């Protein structure tokens, strides 16, 4: 009797240690460029990493910029140049996002979220981490947004 009980307990224990299998999802479809409407807001979040970073940036279609670094408690505001705004619009229009197929096991990676809301009420959201960023097609936009964020935090501090 004790062997049967031990076998059952070990089976339950091992089953609890197994990774969860994500629910099946439809094959990810590539998202063509985000239509840039007359008025839009883009929110970019970079979180995670070894340092536990949490940075958020919001840019509006008129070029207003707000960056918050939760770890340092720093918030800066600014204005994009016409060239920076044009580059951002080009990258949004050329975005070809391919949603990663499942969770990754990268504990110390940065996680990136891009959310673009337009005045039509539609919102586009894309997520990736360091291991899926390049394959997702989000890399050019995320890299540019990360550069804008880092520059804003450097220049106003």
Task: Annotate the PLM regions.
Residues 1-8:
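Bacterial N-terminal signal peptides that target proteins for export
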Residues 13-16:
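C-terminal motif of bacterial Sec signal peptides marking the signal peptidase cleavage site
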Residues 76, 81-90:
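Long, charged/polar, surface-exposed segments that mediate recognition or autoinhibition
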Residues 5, 18-49, 70, 74, ...:
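Short, well-ordered, aromatic-rich surface patches in folded extracellular/luminal domains
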Residues 92-95:
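Generic short beta-strand segments
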Residues 57, 76-80, 126:
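Generic detection of short hydrophobic beta-strand segments and adjacent strand-loop junctions
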């Amino acid at each position: 009797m004790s062997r049967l009980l031990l076998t059952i307990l070990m089976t339950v224990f091992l089953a609890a240690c197994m990774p969860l299998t994500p629910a099946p999802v439809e094959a990810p479809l590539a998202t063509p460029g985000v239509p840039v409407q007359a008025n839009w807001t883009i929110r970019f979040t970079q979180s995670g990493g070894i340092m536990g970073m949490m940075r958020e940036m919001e840019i509006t279609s008129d070029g207003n910029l707000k960056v918050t670094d939760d770890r340092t408690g720093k918030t800066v505001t600014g204005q994009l140049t016409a060239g920076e705004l044009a580059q951002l619009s080009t990258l949004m229009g050329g975005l070809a996002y391919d949603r990663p197929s499942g969770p990754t096991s990268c504990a110390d990676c940065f996680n990136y979220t891009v959310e673009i809301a337009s005045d039509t009420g539609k919102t586009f959201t894309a997520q990736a981490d360091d291991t899926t960023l390049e394959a997702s097609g989000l890399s050019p936009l995320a890299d540019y947004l990360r550069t804008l964020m880092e520059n804003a935090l450097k220049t106003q501090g």
